[in-house]
């Protein structure tokens, strides 16, 4: 019996180990107009304050909505919550629509994009100034790429069965070590996510206007594509930061990770210093370090803990260890009105369980570089027949198909255990549908989307068509989890909360920044 099977049987002996898994979803999407251009309207007034609303906020831009679900133990519940919040928002958007693709179209210049606005409070101004810094550092067009983030935590019962009886400190350390083991395996095998669910094989030419690229694109009118690509969003064309590539933050323990993060937020950048901190009285970045704040660190997966008021993410991790992980490699699923579907959630349940129960040796920088090379191959040519990937850095290779099949043998064992606990076959059905995609890459989201793009004559055409269909779906939706009254009440609460924050400010913005960044001294 393998160690993996042994560990799986341990945790599966308690039905609640899987039943109490925690899941939350964050979905980003751009508002755009009937004339197929980016919305220039402010955040819809009817959905409340973007600063304080629990479920409806904005990301980088005023037009870039972000929908957030609370933590749920049930797959159906988290999707119902997302559907309800989409319906409520679209009902307050007039004739504007939600862009259904990760990669933006119709955006040609940074100045087309209004930064997200959060009111007159110091915390609101800090959020907008941070975004101004991102704009000056990397450009706005790159920042309006949309994604889906999946937050995931194992249950207390899961850890109880896996680790047995422990003191509080021992448990904290064991759980953090297990989550970092998961993260290392995610880098080793997470390329399966863009293979199955990558949804950006093509992009509008406006996105790369004036940008250098070494990619050998084929064109179709104003659409550029790579014939076997899965997720150009995750490629060098997407969110990249050369300054960050030298940070080398360790994933071998929570202490090493926090040390690396603390160093990054204190490392000055000559390049960013040239931008300056102010133009007249206006702050244009929070500081000129490699990272303005910890959230600027780009990563396909992050260890997380809910922060207390005024606490930085690294301080929360240092205080009590890892509480959950945030998967950040999902493109927006264009075929789902809410950008993600049940199969994706169930796959991540199985895959993340497999990554935590499988062996996971410590990882050095050179090994990480080898695994990242596999990701890049899948991102740029993942559907190419016979594509070979590295097995670590030892020179051995295996076809992507053979490797996926090996992983799926283990995932089937997990699927059966999860279904046994739930009394149905939902995980095995997901496994079956995804197995078909291993055999036929054209069944993947990127394969399907590229075929439809070619048939329609361009990615923009597909985006507009799906946006109209999804808008009709959202408007016709009947509430399945929340009530209209509950969401109305949250709007009122959020507006009031913003007013209170603004009324309670005592410091000038400059004084507030001085105090906020006192930890850098």
Curated annotation (Swiss-Prot):
Belongs to the glutamate--cysteine ligase type 1 family. Type 1 subfamily. It catalyses: L-cysteine + L-glutamate + ATP = gamma-L-glutamyl-L-cysteine + ADP + phosphate + H(+). It comes from Aliivibrio fischeri (strain ATCC 700601 / ES114) (Vibrio fischeri). It is an enzyme of class 6 (ligase). One of its GO terms (cellular component) is cytosol. Keywords: ATP-binding, Glutathione biosynthesis, Ligase, Nucleotide-binding. GO terms for biological process: glutathione biosynthetic process. Signal peptide: none annotated. It comes from the Bacteria. Pathway: Sulfur metabolism; glutathione biosynthesis; glutathione from L-cysteine and L-glutamate: step 1/2. GO terms for molecular function: ATP binding; glutamate-cysteine ligase activity; metal ion binding. Its EC number is 6.3.2.2. SUPFAM superfamilies: Glutamine synthetase/guanido kinase. HAMAP family: Glu_cys_ligase. This is Glutamate--cysteine ligase.
């Amino acid at each position: 019996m393998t160690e993996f099977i042994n560990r799986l049987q341990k945790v599966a002996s308690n039905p609640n180990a899987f039943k109490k898994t925690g899941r939350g979803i964050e979905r980003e999407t751009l508002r755009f107009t009937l004339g197929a251009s980016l919305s220039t309207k402010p955040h819809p007034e009817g959905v409340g304050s973007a600063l304080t609303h629990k479920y409806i906020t904005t990301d980088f831009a005023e037009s870039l909505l972000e929908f957030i679900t609370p933590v749920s133990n049930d797959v159906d519940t988290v999707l119902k919550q997302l559907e309800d919040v989409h319906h409520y928002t679209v009902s307050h958007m007039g004739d504007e629509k939600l862009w259904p693709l990760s990669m933006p179209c119709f955006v040609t210049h940074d100045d087309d994009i209004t930064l997200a606005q959060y009111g007159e409070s110091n915390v609101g101004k800090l959020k907008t100034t941070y975004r101004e810094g991102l704009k000056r550092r990397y450009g706005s067009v790159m920042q309006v790429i949309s994604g889906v983030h999946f937050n995931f935590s194992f249950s207390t019962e899961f850890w109880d069965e896996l680790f047995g009886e422990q003191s509080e400190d021992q448990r904290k350390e064991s759980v953090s070590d297990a989550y970092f083991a998961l993260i290392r395996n995610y880098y080793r095998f997470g390329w399966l996510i863009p293979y199955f669910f990558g949804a950006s094989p093509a992009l509008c030419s406006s996105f790369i206007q004036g940008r250098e690229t070494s990619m050998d694109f084929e064109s179709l009118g104003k659409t550029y594509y790579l014939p076997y690509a899965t997720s150009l969003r995750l490629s060098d064309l997407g969110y990249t930061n050369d300054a960050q590539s030298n940070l080398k933050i360790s994933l071998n323990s929570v202490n090493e990770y926090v040390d690396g993060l603390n160093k990054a937020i204190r490392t000055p950048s000559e390049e960013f210093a040239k931008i300056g901190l102010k133009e007249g009285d206006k702050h244009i970045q929070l500081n000129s370090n490699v990272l303005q704040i910890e959230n600027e660190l780009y990563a396909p997966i992050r260890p997380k803990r809910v922060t207390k008021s005024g606490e930085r993410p690294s301080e929360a991790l240092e205080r009590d260890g890892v509480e959950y992980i945030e998967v950040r490699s999902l493109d927006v699923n264009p075929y789902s009105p809410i950008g993600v579907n049940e199969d994706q959630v169930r796959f991540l349940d199985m895959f993340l369980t497999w990554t935590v129960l499988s062996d996971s040796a410590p990882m050095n920088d050179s090994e990480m570089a080898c695994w990242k090379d596999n990701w890049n191959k899948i991102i740029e040519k993942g559907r190419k027949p016979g594509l070979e990937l590295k097995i670590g850095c030892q020179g051995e290779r295996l076809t992507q198909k053979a490797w996926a099949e090996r992983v799926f043998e283990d995932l089937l064992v997990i699927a059966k255990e999860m279904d046994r606990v739930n009394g149905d076959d939902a995980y095995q059905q997901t496994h079956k549908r995804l197995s078909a995609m291993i055999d036929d890459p054209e069944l993947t989201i990127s394969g399907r989307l590229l075929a439809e793009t070619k048939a329609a004559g361009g990615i923009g055409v597909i985006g507009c068509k799906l946006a109209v269909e999804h808008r009709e779906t959202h408007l016709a939706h009947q509430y399945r989890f929340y009530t209209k009254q509950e969401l109305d009440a949250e709007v009122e609460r959020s507006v009031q909360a913003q007013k209170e924050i603004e009324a309670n400010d005592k410091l000038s913005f400059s004084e507030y920044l001085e105090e906020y960044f006192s930890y850098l001294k």
